[in-house]
Design a protein with these regions (language model features):
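PDZ/PDZ-like domain micro-motif
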Residues: 17-37, 269
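Short, flexible surface segments
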Residues: 8, 35-36, 213, 269, ...
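N-terminal, Lys/Arg-enriched amphipathic/low-complexity engagement segments
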Residues: 1-13
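Conserved PDZ fold ligand-binding element
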Residues: 28-50, 274-276, 280-281
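Short, Lys/Arg- and Gly-enriched loop/turn segments at beta-strand edges
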Residues: 45-56, 77, 228-231
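Serine endopeptidase catalytic core focused on the charge-relay Asp
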Residues: 83-84, 90-262, 266, 275-276
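Generic structural signal for well-ordered beta-strand positions
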Residues: 76-77, 121, 280-281
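PDZ-domain C-terminal substructure recognizer with occasional recognition of PDZ-binding tails
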Residues: 54-97
């Protein structure tokens, strides 16, 4: 599936110096804004996108402005003053804070399961920012259809990845994202999509920690273009891991998957792990 998320406010990646008209450099947001901050409002005007932030900065010009930010779990106000700085190849002057920001994310992952009520779990890990490593706080998100166009094989030192495209058509939306956690994303599927896939899926019992055992198991993936079951060997378990994403250690011994991908590649995250007819985990 394709995953698209919109952040809660504007996410700060970092700050950097900007060049003023006289050729000197200033860094207005230094020691004020930090990677991982979320800008929620400017002078008490809500900010939901990069465009909102840009417009409000331009309106404020070089007057000190109050930013309402979320830092960790604490909401605070900070003050920062924009500067008139050069931008682009033509050195056009704009009011700037000298910050790098983002307001959305997109990627491809695998849905692990859904229940009779259409509640699903996917991805097997949280959606984090690639620059800061921070788990993103999402205001809302959506699942879309995705097509796999190719596979970059994994090799030592390079995990490889599935290469694909997400269809953002309204008719391609499969559901919504309600929670982004460190062990996966969770949400609700559309009724239309549930009706479309209900006869194509096999129900499994839910497994518990005490059901795990070393030895053979399977993962389910459509990495080949159609859904397949691939053999793996469960090697060891950590029932109280410091990282909740690393409780199961297994290796792939299915030659079909090894020849296709070289093992587990990015984009296969969330593939269900099946042992003795139960879903016992996710890649």
């Amino acid at each position: 599936v394709g995953i698209y998320g919109i952040t809660n406010g504007v996410f700060v990646l970092g700050s950097s110096p900007v060049e003023l008209a006289d050729g000197t450099f200033r860094q207005p947001a230094e020691h004020v804004l930090f990677p991982g901050d979320y800008i929620l409002a400017v002078n008490h005007h809500a900010v939901t996108s990069k465009e909102d932030l840009t417009v409000l900065i331009q309106k404020n010009e070089t007057v000190s402005m109050v930013l309402t930010i979320l830092r960790g779990n604490e909401q605070i106000d900070v003050s920062v003053t924009p500067v008139l700085a050069k931008t682009g190849e033509n050195n056009k002057l704009n009011y700037m804070l000298g910050i790098w920001v983002r307001d959305d994310m997109a990627g491809i992952g695998t849905m692990t399961y859904y229940d009779d009520n259409g509640n699903y779990g996917a991805l097997g890990h949280g959606i984090g920012d690639g620059e800061t490593g921070e788990l993103l706080k999402l205001d809302k998100g959506y699942l879309y259809e995705a097509d796999i166009l190719g596979i970059k094989r994994g090799q030592r030192g390079d995990p490889g990845e599935l290469e694909g495209v997400i269809s953002y058509r309204k008719t391609s939306m499969l559901g919504t994202v309600r929670q982004n956690s460190d062990i996966g994303i969770y949400g609700k599927l559309n009724d239309e999509y549930i009706n479309e896939i209900k006869d194509k899926n096999k129900p499994y019992l839910m497994g518990f920690k005490q059901d795990l055992k070393t030895g053979e198991a399977y993962i389910i993936s459509d990495v080949s273009g159609e859904r397949q079951t691939y053999h793996i060997m469960m090697d060891s378990f950590d029932y109280s891991p410091s990282d909740r994403n690393k409780g199961i250690h297994f290796y792939v011994d299915d030659e079909r998957l090894l020849s296709l991908t070289g093992g587990i590649v990015q984009g296969m995250s969330g593939s269900p792990i099946i042992q003795d007819g139960r879903i016992v985990g996710a890649v």
